[in-house]
Amino acid sequence: MSDTEQELQRVIRRHYREKRELQAHIQTLKASVPKNDKGRRKQMLADISRLEAEMEQRHKQELEKFGENPDSSVDSVTADLEKMNLENMPPRPPKAQKRRDRRAHQERRHQERMPAAQAEQLAANRREEEEKVAAILGAKNLEMKTIPADGHCMYRAIQDQLVFSVTIESLRYRTAYYMRKHIDDFLPFFTEPEAGNFYTREDFLRYCDDIVHNASWGGQLELRALSHVLQTPIEVVQANSPTIVIGEEYTRKPVTLVYLHYACDFGEHYNSVKPIEVAGAFGGMAPRLF
């Protein structure tokens, strides 16, 4: 096999992995927005459509750089990859799920023609949320610090405030490990987003695998696990709800996260915080809060 063919196969394998990661991210997005919040669901579906189109276009451009039609190679490598991952793939979706997917696709197409008034309302909600959060944080002499919206935002916001060096991969692994070791403390809180059925132990273990291997978004249950892992309280500031404190049994200075509903195009998002910089003070990075 030539070097060009080997490189092509590496690219195709990466594309396959990226597609699976995007699908996992999409499922998390769908579960994160309440069904009765039509405005946010429409925005979320439009974001999903854009993400899919951007990935498809990028993959196409990368394959075209090889100077030939790679369709046959793509089919061959993809078939091999699917065979390798067959045992780890979830079961095929039932007919009801397929109908929901079709409706979601139709809604995405409708969302592409969202009236300007709705876009203006979303922007207004975003500004209002940011102003309220700024007031809450200002009372603590803090201000919001933007974290990338890449599916790792919760873990990145925590990483940003720790005095010791730790990778996102390590935080995800330690979160999943703790949840597996204390499955009875977490399992009762997990239900299927659509049907509402409680997770089986197998469902829960697959969920923990996603924490480690995918850019799955985290929530309060993952924060509970992280507070135990770090032995540190974690407080979550929101614009329209009281601040939530997780891990109050620990005495260290808390890590503070900001939970946003409108600041990110993908749906809910976590940001970090930092001390407010005083004008005229000596430069340098603000101290971390751990």
Curated annotation (Swiss-Prot):
It holds the Pfam family OTU. Its EC number is 3.4.19.12. GO terms for molecular function: cysteine-type deubiquitinase activity. One of its GO terms (biological process) is protein K11-linked deubiquitination. It comes from the Eukaryota. Residues 142-276 form the OTU domain. Residues 49-68 have a biased composition (Basic and acidic residues). Residues 259-269 are annotated as: His-loop. The keyword Membrane does not apply. Residues 211-221 are annotated as: Variable-loop. Residues 95-108 have a biased composition (Basic residues). Residues 147-153 are annotated as: Cys-loop. The active site is at D150, C153, H269. Residues 27-117 are annotated as: Disordered. This is OTU domain-containing protein 6A. The gene is Otud6a.
